[in-house]
Regions:
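FIC/Doc superfamily catalytic core
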Residues: 1-328
Length: 328
């Protein structure tokens, strides 16, 4: 019996976009300060979560999502707040998830939808359809008794296919949405899983907020899914996602450059001597050859704290005489 292969064509336009994205990623890999920009990474993670949930009609703003993640009290629908907490938890799991495992996909869905739906993490046992804003049914998913077999076939293909990951992950994203494996939460889980697949190829994708670009082009996203379904192959969706990924990579390159340009020579000097274990101001000043505590605090410590590059052992009492600083 022939192995299942999702229907799609590799076109010249796809290959051109793939080549351009790979080239852009090559330029981005030269910007090695991303690991030293925890604030940018955190901002991008929050953008990913807020955007993906907003597509599913979550009402919380970027500021509110940030507050929820930072443990602050937020006024809003309890389900929306829980959805943010769940999404943050599952995005933190990305490095541990195996994107080629159906069991890990189910585990991720279980965390994503915990407390929001019955049967979180379990393949659906009922019929589902996709309804647009006008209340029109735009997609009827395959019968529930076919879901397990379809997903196993899809993962078998995903694991063995030699198709370039930018294209392969987009095909998976479309096929997953078509099958609609779960009763709810398929959209946010599908977007998470494409990120997981891309990060298995290039780890930097863990911090590229592709979901934000999808949200900005939400109508085209659903149109690409609809056209692919009508045409019986995922070409339209692949092209849409490649365009989204290209834009997201370009925006990360811009944002990284902007963050780097705001790092002063003093901060760079501090980052070259500070360690990941706590160090006193006296130790750091000695390594930097500084005498003035005022200069040290104003030009070195405070800007590095503001940039999210270092942290204090006692942040509630900044002037504590036993205060220590460490690299994040």
């Amino acid at each position: 019996m022939d192995k299942y292969v999702p229907p799609y064509d590799i076109t010249e336009e796809m290959l051109e976009l793939t080549s351009e994205i790979t080239e852009d990623l090559g330029k981005l890999s030269n910007v090695n300060d991303l690991e030293r920009l925890p604030r940018l990474r955190r901002v991008n993670r929050i953008k990913s979560i807020q955007s993906s949930l907003a597509i599913e009609n979550n009402t919380l703003s970027l500021e509110q999502v940030t507050d929820v993640i930072n443990g602050k009290r937020v006024l809003g629908p309890q389900d929306d707040i829980l959805a943010v907490k769940n999404a943050f938890a599952v995005y933190k799991m990305l490095p541990e998830l195996n994107p080629f495992s159906l069991e890990d996909l189910k585990k991720a869905h279980g965390v994503m939808m915990n407390g929001l739906v019955e049967g979180a993490g379990e393949l659906r046992t009922g019929s589902v359809g996709v309804i647009n804003e006008q209340g029109k049914v735009i997609h009827v998913a395959p019968p529930h008794d076919m879901v397990k077999g379809l997903m196993e076939q899809l993962f078998d293909w995903l694991k063995t296919s030699k198709t370039q990951m930018l294209i392969r992950s987009s095909i998976f994203h479309y096929e997953f949405e078509f099958i609609h494996s779960f009763m709810d939460g398929n959209g946010r889980t599908g977007r998470l899983w494409q990120t997981s697949l891309l990060a298995s190829w290039k780890p930097i994708f863990e911090w590229i907020p592709i979901e934000s670009i999808i949200k900005d082009n939400q109508e085209e996203y659903y149109r690409a899914i609809g056209l692919s379904t009508a045409e019986g192959k995922s070409n339209r969706f692949i092209l849409f996602m490649l365009g989204v990924i290209k834009k997201a990579v370009s925006e990360l390159a811009r944002d990284t450059h902007n963050h780097q340009s705001h790092i002063s020579n003093q901060i760079r000097a501090l980052m070259s001597v500070i360690e990941t274990y706590p160090m006193s101001a006296v130790e750091l000043m000695e390594k930097l050859g500084l005498k003035s505590r005022v200069t040290f605090r104003k030009n070195y410590i405070q800007p590095a704290l503001d940039a999210g590059l270092i942290a204090m052992t006692d942040p509630d009492t900044p002037t504590n005489r036993n205060q220590r600083y460490f690299k994040i």
